[in-house]
């Protein structure tokens, strides 16, 4: 599958403030290495998204993430979610979806921390998602969500603890393809080890 696979899809990638990103890796990685890791994974996710989708947007409050997104050719949306918001990630995703919906009839939320996701996997997931109004790919643990797809305009992101079950309960169809790279998000030292086993060249 080539770039034509999903040119009517808009991809949303959300990135936290880099100062607080990937805090669970702090015991094994100091802050400068965590920042390099986050930016490297973001750049990889953008490249994979562009391989199969027509529009890629990064939403973040962080100026360094903005620079990385712009350099990679992605649209940047400033995340103006107020401090103390009870659901900041999903609020940011809803904001980005509202801005992309006019130009992209189909939407995808792709996690920013997927260092071994491949263009082939992403294109296959997009193709599978076309058969459903709303669908998702669970992470390798089966509890989180690596990607959320909408082909009817109603994204309804429910990321957070047990997001896979929350998306199932909300009616989203679980896509069950053999996509180990797409399912391998990195939050913990164990995740880093698995990503390396799958061939990730991590920028540490």
UniProtKB/Swiss-Prot annotation:
Pfam families: CofC. InterPro entries: CofC, Nucleotide-diphossugar_trans. Keywords: GTP-binding, Nucleotide-binding, Nucleotidyltransferase, Transferase. Phosphoenolpyruvate binds at residues 145, 160, 163. Signal peptide: none annotated. GO terms for biological process: F420-0 metabolic process. GO terms for molecular function: GTP binding; phospholactate guanylyltransferase activity. It catalyses: phosphoenolpyruvate + GTP + H(+) = enolpyruvoyl-2-diphospho-5'-guanosine + diphosphate. Its EC number is 2.7.7.105. SUPFAM superfamilies: Nucleotide-diphospho-sugar transferases. Pathway: Cofactor biosynthesis; coenzyme F420 biosynthesis. It is an enzyme of class 2 (transferase). Guanylyltransferase that catalyzes the activation of phosphoenolpyruvate (PEP) as enolpyruvoyl-2-diphospho-5'-guanosine, via the condensation of PEP with GTP. It is involved in the biosynthesis of coenzyme F420, a hydride carrier cofactor. Belongs to the CofC family. HAMAP family: CofC. This is Phosphoenolpyruvate guanylyltransferase. It comes from Mycobacteroides abscessus (strain ATCC 19977 / DSM 44196 / CCUG 20993 / CIP 104536 / JCM 13569 / NCTC 13031 / TMC 1543 / L948) (Mycobacterium abscessus). The gene is fbiD.
């Amino acid at each position: 599958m080539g770039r034509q696979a999903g040119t009517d899809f808009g991809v949303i990638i959300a990135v936290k403030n880099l100062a607080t990103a990937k805090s669970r890796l702090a015991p094994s990685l100091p802050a400068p290495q965590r920042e390099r890791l986050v930016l490297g994974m973001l750049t990889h996710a953008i490249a994979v998204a562009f391989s199969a989708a027509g529009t890629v947007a990064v939403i973040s409050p962080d100026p360094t993430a903005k620079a990385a997104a712009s350099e990679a050719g992605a649209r940047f949306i400033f995340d103006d979610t107020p401090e103390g918001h009870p659901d900041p990630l999903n609020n940011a995703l809803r904001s980005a979806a509202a801005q992309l919906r006019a130009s992209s009839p189909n939407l995808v939320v792709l996690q920013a921390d997927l260092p071994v996701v491949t263009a082939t996997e992403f294109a296959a997931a997009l193709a599978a998602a076309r058969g459903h109004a709303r669908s998702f790919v669970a992470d390798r643990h089966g509890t989180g969500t690596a990607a959320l797809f909408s082909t009817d305009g109603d994204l309804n992101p429910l990321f957070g603890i047990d997001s896979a079950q929350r998306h199932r309960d909300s009616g989203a169809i679980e896509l069950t393809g053999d996509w180990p790279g797409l399912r391998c998000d990195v939050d913990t030292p164990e995740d880093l080890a698995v990503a390396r086993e799958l061939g990730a060249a991590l920028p540490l």
